[in-house]
Design a protein with these regions (language model features):
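Class I S-adenosyl-L-methionine-dependent methyltransferase catalytic core
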Residues: 1-211
Length: 211
């Protein structure tokens, strides 16, 4: 069974009606979009624990050109893909969208060049790393710190990347020492952490660009 969820633009997308899925609220999505602004144009976006894909849909409407969404529940992943495709059809045919049904940790361990990512086959020579990562696991899942480490050690990100964590204001996750807190916002029971790589730690090759 599915409900409806309205994007900032007014477009409605499908939303799974189950206890395991907690859609990011309109207020929080709008805050993220306002903070990131024009940085989203032409950017790449990795959506972790994607759910309905609402946040990725918002990013798509603001200029993101490549999205990879990871969702562990098969039916929810199907809904996510449908939503992203529906939104992309109203924008531009040059957008690359991919939704993969997989468990978060096991997938991140494979790194961005793994064979399951179709983009790597379709776009040889392009940088597989991501400009933005949105991490929104169930608040009580404990799935915050290990993904932070894997994003760095498995080279999912660039020196200039931003990781946005949505979490509970009542139970803030620990920030891995490979990241630095750039910005923190509170919206009722929800908090947003905007993290950037700690460049003092040697997670990046010398050849890695800041762009």
């Amino acid at each position: 069974m599915k409900g409806k969820l309205k994007l900032i633009s007014g477009k409605r997308i499908e939303s799974p009606l189950n206890k395991k899925t907690r859609p990011t609220s309109n207020k929080v999505r709008e805050a993220i979009i306002n903070i990131l602004g024009k940085e989203l144009i032409e950017a790449s976006w990795l959506d972790l624990c994607s759910g309905s894909g609402a946040m990725a849909c918002e990013a798509l409407q603001k200029g993101v050109k490549r999205i990879l969404a990871i969702e562990g529940q098969r039916e929810t992943a199907k809904t996510c893909k449908k939503n992203l495709v529906d939104v992309s059809n109203t924008i531009d045919s040059s957008i690359h969208i991919e939704v993969i049904c997989n468990q978060l940790i096991s997938f991140l361990k494979k790194g961005p060049k793994n064979r399951y990512i179709k983009f790597n086959k379709d776009s040889p020579g392009f940088d597989p790393k991501f400009d933005f990562v949105f991490l929104d696991p169930p608040y009580n899942s404990g799935l915050y710190e290990l993904p932070q480490e894997l994003l760095l050690s498995k080279k999912w990100i660039k020196k200039s990347s931003t990781l946005i964590c949505e979490c509970s204001s009542k139970s803030m996750p620990r920030i891995h020492n490979g990241w630095k807190l750039k910005k923190e916002k509170f919206y009722g029971n929800t908090s947003l952490l905007f993290l950037i790589p700690n460049l003092a730690l040697n997670y990046f090759d010398d050849t890695d660009s800041m762009h």
